[in-house]
C-alpha cells in the first residue's frame, strides 16, 4: 500500500507539473477565447444531430455519463499498454482530446497523458459538456488541410455542418482518429471501412436503426 501511494503521488506530481507548464505559457480562458472567436467556429446547435451522434458513438459513447476522465476506459487502455509494452492513445474521453488539442502537441508520453487529464478536469470545471463537444469538433483535424468541422464539411461536401446527412456525418466522424488513413481523399476503401465502424457504433448505442445503416452502406 505504501509503495502504491508513493506511485500515485509521483503520477500526480508529473501530471500537475506538465499541465502547470502549459498554463503558464497561455491561460485556459485565453486559449478558449482564441478558438471560439474564430469566424467559422461552429456552435453545438449549428451541427447536424446525425453528426453529433456519430462523434459520440465512435469517440466516447459514455460522454454525458462520466466526468473529465472515463476511469473504466482509461484503466482498460493502461492495462493494454502495459501488456503490449507500448504507449497507445486509447482510453481518452472527448474532454481529454480537447485538452490534448489545445494544450499539448501530439507527442506520446506518460507525462503528456497525465497533464492532459489535469487539463480535462479544468475544462469540465469551467465549461458544459456541449461547449466541450464544440471545442473538440472545432479543433479536430480532418485531413486534407481541414481543421475543424466547418472546414471539413465545406471542404468535403460543400455544405454547412447543420446540413450533413447520416452518410456524410458517419464519414466525417471517423476521420480524426487517423486523418492520414481515413480521410476520404486518401483511401476511400479505408474511409468506408471506418465509416462502417462508426455506423456499427451508432447502431449499438441506439442512435440509428439497422435500416438506416444499410441505406448508407448499400
Task: Please describe what each predicted stretch is.
Residues 1, 5-218:
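Juxtamembrane regions of bacterial inner-membrane/periplasmic proteins
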Amino acid at each position: 500500500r505504501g509503495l502504491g501511494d508513493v506511485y500515485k503521488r509521483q503520477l500526480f506530481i508529473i501530471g500537475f507539473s506538465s499541465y502547470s507548464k502549459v498554463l503558464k505559457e497561455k491561460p485556459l480562458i485565453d486559449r478558449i477565447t482564441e478558438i471560439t472567436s474564430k469566424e467559422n467556429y461552429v456552435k453545438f446547435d449549428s451541427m447536424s444531430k446525425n453528426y453529433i451522434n456519430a462523434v459520440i458513438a465512435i469517440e466516447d459513447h459514455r460522454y454525458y455519463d462520466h466526468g473529465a476522465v472515463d476511469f473504466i476506459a482509461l484503466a482498460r487502455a493502461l492495462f493494454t499498454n502495459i501488456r503490449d509494452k507500448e504507449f497507445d492513445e486509447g482510453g481518452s474521453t472527448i474532454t481529454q482530446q480537447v485538452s490534448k488539442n489545445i494544450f499539448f502537441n501530439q507527442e506520446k508520453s506518460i507525462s503528456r497523458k497525465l497533464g492532459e487529464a489535469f487539463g480535462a478536469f479544468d475544462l469540465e470545471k469551467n465549461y458544459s459538456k456541449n461547449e466541450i463537444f464544440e471545442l473538440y469538433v472545432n479543433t479536430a483535424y480532418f485531413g486534407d488541410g481541414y481543421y475543424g468541422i466547418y472546414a471539413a464539411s465545406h471542404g468535403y461536401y460543400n455544405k454547412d455542418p447543420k446540413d450533413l446527412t447520416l452518410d456524410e456525418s458517419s464519414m466525417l466522424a471517423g476521420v480524426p482518429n487517423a486523418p492520414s488513413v481515413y480521410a476520404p481523399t486518401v483511401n476511400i476503401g479505408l474511409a468506408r471501412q471506418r465509416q462502417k465502424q462508426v455506423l456499427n457504433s451508432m447502431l449499438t448505442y441506439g442512435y440509428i436503426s439497422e435500416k438506416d445503416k444499410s441505406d448508407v452502406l448499400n
